Amino acid sequence: FFVRRNTAKGLKKMEYNGLPEKQGLYDPQFEHDACGIGFIANIKGKTSHGIINQAIQILKNLAHRGGVGSEPDTGDGAGILIQMPHAFMKKVCKNEGIKLPKKGDYGVGMLFLSPDKDTREESLERLTKIIDGEKQKLLGIREVPVYDVCIGNSAREAMPHIVQVFIGKGDESLDADSFERKLYIIGKLAEKEIRKSGLDNYFYFASLSARTVVYKGMLTPDQVNEF
């Protein structure tokens, strides 16, 4: 938009700022950009891989809401939030020797850690103490397989080590909302302690919940499924 501005001599000139002037209920100070967001679900709550595929397609259709730099294969970030895939988690955890309780009695933390092995081991030790301090159970830790060949050099150089942390209820009588709050507290305490100490600047929970899991990264929408 081009808007008129008064000059010192009372003359008018045209100036470009991209937004219309404040008028009526409109105020340009409240303008802001947002990421592209899509939502799809089965109204009967039925889970399926088909829903995930459709969500990935939505993500790809929103590629114009993302951005890339000089490397066309390094994006500014993309991801997907899904309902807890209990059957899948149970299957992959069995291969890792991790025994999961029934759905809702455990949470999954999608955790970013330092690429340095010693640093992330110390970070996980501190996280374990925090979980114990909140009287919950660490059930196990799973390495998340990634296919980093599909991403750009800049994204690969900045990529954290990714694991899934499985946390069980310390008290089986704990209701779903209370357990969700416990997981939230664990995540915030861990991020505050570990990042504030300067031990691991990579330490970050993309999600920590008994209900949902987030897969995301410095990706383009087309890379999420492959990565």
What are these regions (language model features)?
Residues 1-13:
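Short, Lys/Arg-enriched N-terminal segments with co-localized hydrophobic residues
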Residues 10-227:
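N-terminal segments that mediate ammonia production and transfer
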